[in-house]
Amino acid sequence: MLNTCRVPLTDRKVKEKRAMKQHKAMIVALIVICITAVVAALVTRKDLCEVHIRTGQTEVAVFTAYESE
């Protein structure tokens, strides 16, 4: 009969696995935030070529220039 035993993961490997899970969660969160921003801009604007955001005295303007061939 084959005798097998499980070797516990070292603390380093456990920490690496935890860090990878956190890294993946951060990437997913960033993607969700970006998609939400694009959808919000599409809902409030007709297109994404020009977006202005004003907060108090600060204004952020984003312009996209493109040419179709």
Curated annotation (Swiss-Prot):
Cellular compartments per GO CC: plasma membrane
Mode of membrane association: Single-pass membrane protein
Disulfide partners: none
InterPro entries for the chain: Hok/gef_toxin, Hok/gef_toxin_CS
Places the protein is found: Cell inner membrane
Location, primary (coarse class): membrane
Protein name according to UniProt: Regulatory protein MokC
The species this protein was found in: Escherichia coli (strain K12)
Gene that encodes the chain: mokC
